[in-house]
């Protein structure tokens, strides 16, 4: 697969709020400009860090539309549209696709303890509903559900399922996914601290929390990996490792 959604550092963008709990679009617009100007390679809106699980459907759709319009094609925008309810995931995905975003990020159904075959059916229904690329999002520590490597192998047969954000924390699983899926499925690290080892296995970058505050630094780490300078990338990774890990617990 020659066309990638992005390579490098994609920020898992926060969703700023006003004191009354509404989305602060003025600050959100400033954040988009901050990332465009400071080396971020893609913006992921309404993901876990963007509090997708606690936004209303209206807020969710409006936030995606705002970020897509504000970014205006300067860097890729990826919209989080996953849900534990297939029909809601389809609705959010169709709404996001209509705004002109470049791709969708779809988390595994949470709480339901879906079977592996259930995952295949769920994601294929979502992928059938749109005409843009989908990044699967595997974060079993939050969802209670892990996409197994052979399930990835089945899922990437769908032409719209082209990538995965792997936040399982299991480097052996990532190696097996790469072995089974090869170039049919792009991999992005879902954990900042594991970006370098994941990229040494062929991942294309990271969907990053750390990039919210250090966009250039995360971009530089990824670029060094893409340039096969893993020794220098690891030096930078070690330098920022404590900060990266602290952000997991905020």
What is the role of each PLM region?
Residues 1, 35, 96, 153-156, ...:
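Structural motif
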Residues 3-11, 17-144:
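Active-site beta->alpha loop and helix N-cap motifs at the rims of alpha/beta catalytic domains
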Residues 248-250:
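Conserved small/polar residues in nucleotide/adenosyl-binding loops
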């Amino acid at each position: 697969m020659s066309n990638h959604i992005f390579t490098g550092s994609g920020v898992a963008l926060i969703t700023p709020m006003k004191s009354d709990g509404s989305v602060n679009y003025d600050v959100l617009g400033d954040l988009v400009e901050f990332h465009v100007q400071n080396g971020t390679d893609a913006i992921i809106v309404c993901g876990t860090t963007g509090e997708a699980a606690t936004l209303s459907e209206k807020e969710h759709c409006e936030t995606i539309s705002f970020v897509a319009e504000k970014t205006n094609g300067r860097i890729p925008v990826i919209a989080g549209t996953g849900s534990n309810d297939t029909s809601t995931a389809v609705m959010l995905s169709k709404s996001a696709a209509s705004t002109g975003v470049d791709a969708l990020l779809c988390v595994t159904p949470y709480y339901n303890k879906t079977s592996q075959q259930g995952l295949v059916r769920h994601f294929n229904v979502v992928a059938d509903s749109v005409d843009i690329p989908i990044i699967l999002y595997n974060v079993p520590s939050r969802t209670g559900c892990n996409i197994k490597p052979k399930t990835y192998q089945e899922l990437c047969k769908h032409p719209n399922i082209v990538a995965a954000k792997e936040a399982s924390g299991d480097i052996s699983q990532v190696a097996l996914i790469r072995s089974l899926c090869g170039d049919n499925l792009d991999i992005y690290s879902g954990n900042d601290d594991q970006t370098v080892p994941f990229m040494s296995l062929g991942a294309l970058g990271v969907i990053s929390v750390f990039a919210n505050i250090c966009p250039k630094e995360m971009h530089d780490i990824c670029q060094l990996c893409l340039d096969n300078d893993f020794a220098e990338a690891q030096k930078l990774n070690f330098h920022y490792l404590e900060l990266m890990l602290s952000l997991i617990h905020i």
